């Protein structure tokens, strides 16, 4: 949802499943991804700016990792050159005592920006290595925003993979992240084919779902995306993450969805913990509030699991069974 404005998801939402159907769907997910005894991991999308909009440096990332360490050791970012992300993030990953890794992002638009992104990869990956680089995403919700046609995005995924794996010689998987409905609806098939992995983003808040429907909606959306990825790949053995999901804790309502700490906590416990128990790895959007994005007239600054001062909003340990 980085750089995402409040577009309407509601018309694209699948009908919520019954509780029994959701349980069956989640069981299918588990059998398709990991052994049933293996819980999915919790990771966080991490912004590269302070609350005032200034860029983070290595010490700032180290401080982020320290407060995130009880819950995860993996984060994802969205660009390599913006805020000189790689220059300061890669040393932090290497220095942190908590063994953090990252899924790095490459922003594929516009052409000049894209060139800067690749230059950052060429400069800093050889310098710092990839021991703490789990994967690379080329774009985030590029198809959803119509930033690039699917075939052009696929070409840029191949381009970055060639740069990283062939030219630089690093065995790092390359894929992308987009809204669940773009995968489920089939318009991203050529991108699925091009990708080593797929991330599916899903925000029931932006579908206007209330507390009665948010969990069922999230699980049914995720299953629909996963099934399409498996179909296109021709195998159930795919690398698939929930790339972004979360719930705002302040700001205006959207349809029947209210933005409160209590509902965000409920969404975490009911939807996210449920799907993790079935073996799906998730990236929570996001680690910290990003105050620089706006004010109380928007929910965009308030998706953090923690406030911008790095204090926790609600329990991030799964408690319900």
UniProtKB/Swiss-Prot annotation:
UniProt signal peptide: 1-21
Enzyme Commission number(s) from the entry: 3.2.1.58
- A Pfam family it matches: Glyco_hydro_17
Family matches, as InterPro entries: Beta-glucan_modifiers (IPR050732), Glyco_hydro_17 (IPR000490), Glycoside_hydrolase_SF (IPR017853)
Give the molecular function GO annotations.
glucan endo-1,3-beta-D-glucosidase activity; glucan exo-1,3-beta-glucosidase activity
Superkingdom as given in the UniProt entry: Eukaryota
* Keywords assigned by UniProt, alphabetized: Cell wall, Glycoprotein, Glycosidase, Hydrolase, Secreted, Signal
Its Gene Ontology biological processes? cell wall organization; fungal-type cell wall beta-glucan metabolic process
Tell me the protein's name. Answer: Glucan 1,3-beta-glucosidase
Q: What is the lineage of its organism?
A: Eukaryota, Fungi, Dikarya, Ascomycota, Taphrinomycotina
């Amino acid at each position: 949802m980085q750089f995402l404005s409040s577009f309407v998801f509601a018309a694209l939402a699948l009908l919520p499943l019954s509780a029994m159907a959701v349980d069956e769907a989640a069981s299918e997910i588990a059998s398709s991804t990991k052994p049933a005894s293996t819980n999915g991991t919790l990771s966080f999308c991490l912004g590269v700016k302070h609350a005032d909009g200034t860029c983070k440096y290595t010490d700032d990332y180290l401080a982020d990792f320290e407060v995130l360490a009880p819950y995860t050791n993996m984060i994802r970012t969205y660009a390599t050159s913006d805020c000189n992300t790689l220059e300061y993030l890669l040393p932090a990953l290497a220095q942190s005592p908590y063994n953090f890794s990252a899924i790095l992002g490459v922003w594929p638009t516009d052409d000049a920006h894209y060139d800067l992104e690749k230059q950052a990869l060429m400069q800093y990956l050889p310098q710092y290595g990839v021991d703490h680089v789990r994967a690379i995403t080329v774009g985030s919700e590029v198809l959803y925003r119509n930033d690039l046609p699917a075939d052009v995005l696929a070409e840029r995924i191949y381009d970055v993979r060639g740069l990283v794996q062939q030219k630089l010689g690093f065995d790092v998987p390359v894929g992308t992240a987009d809204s669940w409905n773009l995968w489920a609806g089939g318009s991203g098939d050529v991108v699925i084919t091009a990708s080593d992995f797929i991330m599916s983003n899903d925000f029931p808040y932006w579908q206007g779902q209330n507390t009665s429907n948010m969990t069922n909606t999230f699980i049914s959306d995720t299953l629909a995306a996963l099934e399409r990825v498996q179909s296109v790949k021709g195998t159930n053995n795919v690398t698939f993450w929930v790339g972004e999901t979360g719930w705002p804790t302040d700001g205006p309502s959207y349809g029947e969805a209210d933005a409160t700490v209590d509902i965000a906590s409920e969404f975490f416990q009911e939807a996210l913990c449920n799907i993790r128990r079935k073996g799906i790895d998730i990236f929570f959007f996001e680690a910290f509030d990003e105050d620089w994005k706006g004010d109380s007239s928007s929910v965009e600054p308030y998706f953090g699991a923690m406030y911008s001062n790095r204090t926790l909003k609600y329990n991030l340990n799964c408690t319900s069974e």
